[in-house]
């Protein structure tokens, strides 16, 4: 079997496992989001970490995505601001609290926080700050990765908390320790990371299920259409005024 096929099979197996084990929680997450949308309230998605940020971008200003999604795109942990800088900031105690404060999350809001490892300081502090403010929290992370990471690892929050232990609803992404899944003969380090596929699948599944739940109540939530198709700009423009000024990065 060639390596591309091996990687393909790994990706498919991960997605199957998510479907088999996390469907109920994905439905619960969709219910939480649908309640926000029915009240015309935003829900926030934060991926504190270099590649975890991709998860928040996946649901934001995205064709087929809910317009009520507000991505927390803090420059501190974006790779475009410097990869090593991003890593150091996501390990900085207190930083996550500053980010939540900057987006002014408040009681009754909903935060989805995505981090494959679920241990770093920015992740844990963001959840702790959100909970202090009465914000509902959903976490997407690997329980296995967090549980197998030693307490003295430098990325860990001083509390030693794991994301999945402190959120209101935890969705287990099942990512193996180290993320990469493909072994190549003669190479010590594995290649072929998997977490971006899994995070995108989980988040888009939540979007789909949220929309389906709302449809059962005869509610049509505003959904982005690609600006690169005929009529896309016209479709989106009818909703922009509802969200401009509310969604920080719009």
Kindly give the residue locations of the regions a language model identified:
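Generic N-terminal amphipathic, Lys/Arg-enriched alpha-helix
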Residues: 1-20
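Conserved, well-structured ligand/cofactor-binding cores
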Residues: 8, 93-97, 121, 243-245, ...
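A short, well-structured juxtamembrane/interface segment
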Residues: 21-36
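Active-site phosphate/pyrophosphate-binding segments
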Residues: 25, 39-41, 64, 212-250
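Glycine-rich phosphate-binding loops that contact phosphosugars or nucleotide phosphates
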Residues: 48-201, 207
């Amino acid at each position: 079997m060639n390596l591309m096929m091996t990687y393909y099979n790994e990706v498919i197996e991960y997605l199957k496992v998510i479907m088999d084990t996390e469907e109920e929680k994905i439905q619960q997450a969709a219910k939480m989001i649908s309640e926000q949308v029915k009240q015309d309230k935003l829900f926030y998605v934060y991926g504190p970490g270099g590649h975890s940020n991709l998860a928040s971008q996946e649901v934001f200003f995205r064709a087929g995505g809910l317009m009520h999604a507000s991505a927390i795109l803090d420059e501190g942990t974006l790779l475009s601001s410097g990869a090593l800088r991003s890593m150091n900031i996501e390990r900085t105690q207190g930083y996550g609290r500053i980010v939540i404060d900057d987006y002014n999350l408040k009681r009754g809001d909903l935060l989805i926080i995505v981090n494959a490892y679920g241990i770093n300081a920015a992740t844990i502090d963001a959840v702790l700050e959100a909970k202090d403010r009465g914000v509902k929290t959903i976490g997407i992370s690997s329980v296995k990765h967090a549980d197998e990471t030693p307490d003295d690892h430098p990325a860990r929050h001083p509390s030693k908390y794991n994301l999945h232990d402190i959120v209101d609803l935890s969705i287990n992404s099942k990512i193996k320790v180290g993320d990469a899944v493909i072994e190549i003969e003669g190479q010590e380090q594995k290649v072929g990371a998997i977490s971006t596929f899994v995070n995108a699948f989980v988040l888009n599944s939540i979007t789909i299920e949220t929309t389906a739940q709302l449809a059962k109540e005869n509610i049509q939530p505003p959904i982005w259409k690609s600006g690169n198709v005929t009529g896309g700009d016209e479709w989106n423009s009818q909703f922009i005024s509802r969200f401009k000024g509310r969604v920080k990065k719009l």
